[in-house]
Amino acid sequence: MKPSSPTSHDVIIVGGGLAGLTLALQLRRRFPELDVLVLERHAHPVPEACHKVGESSVEIGAHYFENVLGLKQHLMERQLKKFGFRFFFSDGQRDLAAVTELGASRPLPVPSWQIDRGIFENFLGEEVQRQGVRFVDQAVVRCFELSQDDAPHRVSLHRVGGDVQSAIARWVIDASGC
């Protein structure tokens, strides 16, 4: 099928996981006038029991989520606060109560979080849309056409069960993961 006329945006982010959605949110918070399009190949919402790399934050990540992205309320209400890094040394023991544990014994000044990625990504998908980002799931990117001059870049995509579409933007960011 022949692609329809391209939609025009300031930024296209390919990938609607943790990296793509947090970047979209940060861009909208910093530059509210930007037209941001996020393309995600999987259907949303994702399963809540979704295990991926990045489930455990460190303090600088928590600072980013809370203060740069303004997600403190979500973290406090829906995620599990933790005491920073913890190390366990088995010393040949199989019983967890018998192993050596090294880590903070009280809350740190800046908390860190054990993040449930499914819940977090679903929240981020909803939040970016509340902030005016266009979020398109089930969008399989077929090709990029990167401009060599000041012309916009083009992304061609296929919607599951739909037609071939294209979008153009000054910036195209690959946050598609592996």
Where are these regions (language model features)?
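Beta1/beta-strand and adjacent pyrophosphate-binding region of the FAD-binding site
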Residues: P3-A19, L37-L39
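Glycine-rich FAD pyrophosphate-binding loop
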Residues: R28-V53
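N-terminal FAD cofactor-binding segment of flavoenzymes
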Residues: V46-R94
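Conserved Rossmann-like nucleotide-cofactor binding loop
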Residues: A19, L23, H44
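Short, mixed charged/polar active-site loops
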Residues: P6, Q93-A97, G162-S166
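Predominantly flavin-linked oxidoreductase catalytic cores and closely associated redox partners
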Residues: Q26, V46, E127-C178
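Active-site acidic short loop of glycosyltransferases
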Residues: S8-H9, E33, I168-R170
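Short beta-strand to alpha-helix junction loop
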Residues: I60, S105-E127
